[in-house]
Curated annotation (Swiss-Prot):
Organism: Mycoplasma capricolum subsp. capricolum (strain California kid / ATCC 27343 / NCTC 10154)
Swiss-Prot/TrEMBL cofactor(s): Mg(2+); Mn(2+); Ca(2+)
Gene Ontology CC annotation, any one: chromosome
InterPro entries tied to this protein: DNA_gyrase_B_C, HATPase_C_sf, ParE_type2, Ribosomal_Su5_D2-typ_SF, Ribsml_uS5_D2-typ_fold_subgr, Topo_IIA, Topo_IIA-like_dom_sf, Topo_IIA_B
Name of the molecule in the record: DNA topoisomerase 4 subunit B
Cofactor note: Binds two Mg(2+) per subunit. The magnesium ions form salt bridges with both the protein and the DNA. Can also accept other divalent metal cations, such as Mn(2+) or Ca(2+).
Misc. comment: There is a bona fide GyrB elsewhere in this organism (UniProtKB:Q2ST75).
Record-linked Pfam families: DNA_gyraseB (PF00204), DNA_gyraseB_C (PF00986), HATPase_c (PF02518), Toprim (PF01751)
Signal peptide boundaries: none
Binding site for Mg(2+) 1: E426, D499
Length: 643
């Protein structure tokens, strides 16, 4: 990185005081669910990573403590401990004043992930306990807060030291978060990603509750990142790396073409994942496609005015695109930093990629021709798949072939599509009960009788031959694959309803894999849900009854109940009659449903590859760590994974 100027008390600026964070936490961390809880961790970790970006930190240690607090340790410069111009010690300002930090201009940090002084103070505001130990200027200082940022122990000199760095420990406030327990796997994946983006940086994660430990350090991070994503895909090219700088914007890219049908392109700006893309990814795609088309034209592979389609040329592409942009140039669209808006990033990345790839294609003609051959094959497959999709669409208009849906879909009678719901139900038995128990005004039922094909292993043209897949596509009514149009869907909710067992979980995963690969906008626009049927029916002697949804609810019931009762454990949806199914699983007033969302595309890729791939041991381990047939929240983000 380029030189960084002084980082001391004078570099800390205050924009406004800390107000109303506890009253409206969603404004600062997005939500108070699992995602919001872990956002507290990312803010503290990202501060440490900014020290690494600036060239002062080589190791970050994260510890999940036994009391469910979390500790983040870095060996950076340490937070300045002198008096701030506001008359308070600088650490007190950083941790108790919103928008206080050293990253609002380019004096202390040339580029950083964001205004992380905000994060430190917000993390403090949403914690029962927050403590910082600072190693700087051969001295150790401590400062402590409690109950949402109230100063418990002023900045205090503790001892002398030769170390430098900062240690933060905080305990989230369980009166604010719906579930204040940290997820080891989620944190591990995020830390691994940070290590991959910062070559040489060592990051460790320890869980003192379950005695787990992982360590990440990569000497060639982006190359390793691409290897992770490519995994068992068949490569077409070697991994290509591009590193250059223009207009004070540093561009680092690693990419590889594979034989796979899907593309994976992830973008980062100053280490922040841009889940909605932005100017850097627009520039990357434009530069790459222009270089390949120009090469194909120069080599007489294509006719004069013929150009390969951008989608066909990106099929099978795996790429990581990172840019480091000075603070005075970086712009994001919206508050969440999910989309880069810096206009210079497009022109810089496009020119760097175009020049490099133009040279690479000429120097690697055999591989270049293979990339173009694959694009031409993708074009043929796209046309064949389109014809198959059109054939499926035409089923609706042909009486003699309308038997595909006959006896399967029981439609809703309501005309307002956004209010209608489609239940995808496991088996004929449950499908029959669902048809009888539904509210026909807005609920449609599609029983799934046969086997849903594994979308992770089959090409789209083969998927479209599967009868269950055809039925789902027809029922949803918005096309599939590249032709999918979210504005055409027939339902505001698509609800997967299966038995609460491993077979049911497998069907859920098959359907979610299909939606993720070929109707991703359904998940992005939060249209997909999973129904949670109860596990137990409790019947009392007076014939009154209640339903319990999981073991935890049963345990709570047993601790407080004083009446005699009989208990029924439901093994499947088919054991419930129509009235019971309506009362417990379909009535909007009583049911519990999970909304499926995507917040991290990399985790999504890994999850689907693990669950639907060939590695049995990896799949078993993932299920053991992540799959629980119980309810934690009425709405859980099952797939916490960037688009």
């Amino acid at each position: 990185m380029a030189e960084n100027k002084k980082y001391d008390e004078s570099a800390i600026q205050v924009l406004e005081g800390l107000e109303a964070v506890r009253k409206r936490p969603g404004m600062y961390i997005g939500s108070t669910d699992n995602k919001g809880l872990h956002h507290l961790v990312w803010e503290i970790v990202d501060n440490a990573i900014d020290e690494a970006l600036a060239g002062y930190c080589t190791q970050i240690d994260v510890i999940l403590e036994k009391d469910n607090s979390i500790t983040v340790i870095d060996n950076g410069r340490g937070i300045p401990t002198g008096m701030h111009k506001t008359g308070k010690p600088t650490p007190e300002v950083i941790f108790s004043v919103l928008h206080a930090g050293g990253k609002f201009d380019s004096t202390a940090y040339k580029s950083s992930g964001g205004l992380h002084g905000v994060g430190s103070s917000v993390t403090n505001a949403l914690s029962k306990r927050f403590k910082a130990i600072i190693y700087r200027d051969k001295k150790i200082h401590e400062i402590e807060f409690k109950n949402g940022g109230k100063l418990e122990k002023p900045l205090t000199f503790i001892n002398t030291t030769y170390k430098t760095g900062t240690t933060i420990n905080f305990l989230p406030d369980d009166t604010i978060f719906s579930n204040a327990k940290f997820n080891f796997s989620l944190i591990s994946e995020r830390l691994k990603e940070s290590a991959l983006l910062n070559s040489g940086l060592k990051i460790t994660l320890s869980d003192l509750i379950s005695n787990r430990y992982v360590e990440y350090q990569f000497q060639d991070g982006l190359v390793e990142f691409v290897k992770e994503l490519v995994d068992d895909k068949t490569p077409v090219t070697d991994i290509i790396t591009i590193n250059n700088e223009s207009k004070n914007i540093i561009v680092e890219i690693a990419l590889q073409y594979t034989e796979d049908d899907n593309e994976i392109i992830l973008g980062f700006a100053n280490n922040v994942k841009t889940i909605d893309g932005g100017t850097h990814l627009v520039g990357f795609k434009s530069g790459l496609i222009r270089a390949i088309n120009d090469y194909a034209k120069d080599q007489k592979i294509l006719k004069d005015k013929t150009k390969l389609d951008s989608n066909d040329l990106r099929e099978g592409l795996v790429a990581i695109v990172t840019v480091k942009i000075p603070e005075n140039l970086i712009e994001y669209e919206g508050q969440t930093k999910s989309k880069l808006g810096t206009s210079d990033a497009k022109t810089v990345v496009e020119q760097i990629v175009y020049e490099f790839m133009s040279y690479w294609l000429i120097e690697n003609k055999v591989l270049a021709n293979k990339v173009i051959e694959n694009a031409l094959n993708a074009q043929k497959a796209r046309i064949a798949a389109k014809q198959a999709r059109q054939a499926i669409k035409s089923v609706k208009g042909k009486k003699n072939v309308n038997k595909l849906m006959l006896g399967k879909l029981t439609p809703a009678q309501g005309k307002k599509r956004e209010l209608n719901e489609l239940y995808l139900v496991e088996g004929d038995s449950a499908g029959g009960s669902a048809k009888s128990g539904r509210d026909r005004n807005f609920q449609a039922i599609l029983p799934l009788r046969g086997k849903v094909i594994n979308s992770e292993k089959a090409k789209l043209v083969d998927l479209l031959k599967n009868e269950e897949i055809q039925s789902i596509i027809n029922a949803i009514g918005a096309g599939v694959g590249k032709d999918f149009d979210i504005s055409d869907i027939n339902y505001g909710k698509i609800i997967i309803m299966t038995d609460a067992d491993t077979d049911g979980a497998h069907i859920q995963t098959l359907l979610l894999t299909f939606f993720y690969r070929h109707m991703k906008d359904l998940i992005i626009h939060k249209k997909v849900y999973i129904a949670l049927p109860p596990l137990y029916k409790i019947t009392f002697n007076d014939k009154s009854f209640i339903y319990l949804w999981d073991e935890e609810e049963l345990n709570k019931f047993n601790k407080t109940n004083t009446k005699k009762y009989e208990i029924q454990r439901y093994k499947g949806l088919g054991e419930m009659n129509a009235d019971q199914l309506w009362q417990t699983t379909m009535d909007p007033k009583n049911r519990k449903i999970i909304q499926v969302t995507i917040s991290d595309g990399l985790l999504a890729e890994r999850m689907f590859k693990t669950l639907m791939g060939d590695d049995v041991e990896k799949r078993k381990l993932w299920i053991q760590e992540n799959v629980k047939f119980t309810l934690e929240d009425d709405q859980i983000q099952i797939i916490e994974m960037e688009k």
